[in-house]
Curated annotation (Swiss-Prot):
UniProt-listed Gene3D superfamilies: Hotdog Thioesterase (3.10.129.10)
Disulfide bond entries: none
Family: Belongs to the 4-hydroxybenzoyl-CoA thioesterase family. DHNA-CoA hydrolase subfamily.
UniProt-listed InterPro entries: DHNA_CoA_hydrolase (IPR022829), HotDog_dom_sf (IPR029069)
Protein name: 1,4-dihydroxy-2-naphthoyl-CoA hydrolase
Function statement: Catalyzes the hydrolysis of 1,4-dihydroxy-2-naphthoyl-CoA (DHNA-CoA) to 1,4-dihydroxy-2-naphthoate (DHNA), a reaction involved in phylloquinone (vitamin K1) biosynthesis.
EC numbers on record: 3.1.2.28
Reactions accelerated catalytically: 1,4-dihydroxy-2-naphthoyl-CoA + H2O = 1,4-dihydroxy-2-naphthoate + CoA + H(+)
Biological-process GO terms, alphabetical: phylloquinone biosynthetic process
Active site residues according to the UniProt entry: 22
CDD domains with a match to the protein in the record: 4HBT (cd00586)
GO molecular function: 1,4-dihydroxy-2-naphthoyl-CoA thioesterase activity
Pfam families noted in UniProt: 4HBT_2 (PF13279)
Organism of provenance: Prochlorococcus marinus (strain SARG / CCMP1375 / SS120)
Length: 155
């Protein structure tokens, strides 16, 4: 597996496009949650986890996982308007909650100023039985590697 730095898989960038905005020229609120999910997918890919190894498929594509990671909670807060052409830095902070769930906190910045934050929480389930289960190994590794730069903290 290639050398990974936090810079290249937990710190991403996004440019606001015309199609992301509403008639007032600012992003429509739901875009932030879509961008958050896309940033999570990009982070996994940059870390070295392929989508087919993380997400079960119903398209007849053979996958190596029978675990689904549905979103069980999400929220977003906006601090400043976000408009067409804005170049945003997106920082991801993944946090393991227990052996079967985790959340990712997202901070969106424009010129080093926070413009929005989001949080997306996932729960691991067996995709066939829909019963709760442990997180898949790849997600475990991604969470562990993500936490290394934060050090040890008291629970």
């Amino acid at each position: 597996m290639q050398s990974k730095t936090l810079q290249n898989w937990l710190h991403l960038q996004r440019i606001v496009r015309f199609g992301d905005t509403d008639a007032a020229g600012v992003i429509h609120f739901h875009q932030l949650l879509r961008w958050s999910h896309e940033a999570w997918e990009e982070s996994l890919d940059r870390y070295g986890l392929k989508a087919v190894d993380v997400f079960p498929s119903s398209l007849g594509i053979s996958t190596s996982t029978s675990v689904a990671l549905p979103i069980v909670h999400c929220e977003a807060d906006f601090f400043l308007p976000i408009g067409i052409g804005d170049k945003l830095n997106v920082q991801l902070v993944p946090v393991r909650l227990n052996i079967g769930s985790f959340e990712v906190q997202f901070t969106f910045q424009r010129r080093e100023q926070n413009v929005a934050v989001a949080l997306v929480r996932h729960r691991s389930i067996d995709s066939d039985s829909r019963r709760l289960c442990d997180l898949p190994e790849g997600i475990d590794r991604w969470l562990e590697a993500s936490s290394l730069h934060r050090g040890v903290s008291a629970i």
